[in-house]
From Swiss-Prot:
Quaternary organization: Homotetramer, a dimer of dimers. One homotetramer interacts with 1 SecA dimer.
Taxonomic classification: Bacteria, Pseudomonadati, Pseudomonadota, Gammaproteobacteria, Oceanospirillales
Function summary: One of the proteins required for the normal export of preproteins out of the cell cytoplasm. It is a molecular chaperone that binds to a subset of precursor proteins, maintaining them in a translocation-competent state. It also specifically binds to its receptor SecA.
Family matches, as InterPro entries: SecB, SecB-like_sf
Stated family: Belongs to the SecB family.
PANTHER family on file: PROTEIN-EXPORT PROTEIN SECB, PTHR36918
Protein name: Protein-export protein SecB
Organism, scientific name: Alcanivorax borkumensis (strain ATCC 700651 / DSM 11573 / NCIMB 13689 / SK2)
Gene name linked to the record: secB
Amino acid sequence: MADEQQQVFQLQRIYLKDTSFECPGAPEVFLQEWKPKVNVQLNNSARRVGEGDEFEVEITVTVTAKDEAEEKTFYLVEVKQAGIFTVKGIDGEERAQLLGAYCPNLLFPYVREVVSDLVAKGSFPQMVLQPINFDALYQQQRDQQQGNAAAAGETVQ
């Protein structure tokens, strides 16, 4: 019993890793009717930091707003928000779930705030990113990996 490793999950730090706001058509875009087509792309990743039990989890969101004909770009926003988490005594699927779903859920409100602030400072109407179910995205990715492995005759752990 004494040999069992205690499970530890701690948020160490949340930080803005990179951000960019572009308004390539300014000032002419401000004279156009505001009927944007908005495209939101999302990516998240996790990696071990150093030799210890710390992991960096990063969310990258790219938001592009174009006119209806998609000829002119109103704005392009890219935000990379990250956090450092201590994950000790938690392995395998449980750790993968923490890093692939739980941690991104913690970071996403910060991404939403940065995107909203940048768009407002660019003099555009408020952009509020809708909530994202990272648990469902994680499970979908996991199912896809298992399906690909099964097709190749391998097993996924």
